[in-house]
Amino acid sequence: MAGRKNSTFAVTKVRLGNGLQVDTRADTVAGEEPLEIRTGGQTITTTMRTPGHDIELAHGFLHSEGHIASLSDVTEARYCAGATVNGMNTYNLLDIDLAKKNVLDLSDLRLTTTNSACGVCGTSSIEALTKQTRYQIPHIPVDPYVVAKLPDKLRAEQKQFKKTGGIHAAGAFTLDGEPVVIREDIGRHNAADKVIGHLLLEDRLPADDLILVMSSRASFELVQKAAMAGFGMLVAVSAASSLAVETARETGMALVGFARGDRFNLYSGELA
């Protein structure tokens, strides 16, 4: 699995600095493969992800979508053998056995292919989210000195980004800024689901004493996932969308964007 997180290709690099310079050499590219998640023999979703921590990804996705509430809701998660005509296991098909067979209404399930850019976007409203959220979002004052250090701490743990330059990261940090878990994926939504899935598997939800840090922009979808997991603060290195800001304010979540160096934007919440 580790070898599939990235691939090596012959790449022609072109520079125009001091005249045209062309150099062909081996370069590392972030891995991207489909992961189909099934339950009861039916497909829940297919997401384009970077292989690795797929069990966490599946648990995090199901929790973020409101399909499971705790680890006990899943009895088994396993890769499907015989995924090709030759009987090979591609590790791209994951079967999830649920404790309650009727926890998902498969007849009404939104079957989607989730790309690595935006995931399942725009399918929920703020009102629906506030009704669906299981946890009370904690009020966490934003400590500017802690927040300012979080992006660099996240970047320091991005091993695949250092190799490829093309992969997102999500991390759960303590309120003092110490890392609890960091995951990487070509899709920011997958990286967040992997973190949430890890916390679920470790019985660490709700994450009301943790901060979710993203190496991306802050979209509605990421605020949604953070709220479903009980985070009281989301920190992103890039901009926040209008719906993300509105959702954070409605749920009471602190939302930080453009966290770079010694500055950031506070879209929702208050300073400590």
Task: Indicate where each model-derived feature is located.
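Intrinsically disordered, low-complexity regions enriched in acidic/Ser/Thr/Pro/Gln residues
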Residues: M1-A170, T174-L175, P179-I182
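Short glycine-/small-residue-rich flexible loop motifs, especially phosphate/cofactor-binding loops
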Residues: P34, H53, I196, V223, ...
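Short, solvent-exposed amphipathic alpha-helical segments in soluble enzyme
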Residues: G52-D54, L62-H63, I186-G187, I196-L200, ...
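C-terminal binding/interaction regions
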Residues: L109, A239, L243-A272
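General structural feature for long, well-ordered alpha-helical segments within catalytic domains
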Residues: S125, V146, L150, G166, ...
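Glycine- and Gly-Pro-enriched alpha-helical subdomains that act as flexible
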Residues: Q160-S216
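Extracellular/luminal Protease-associated
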Residues: D203-A240, A248
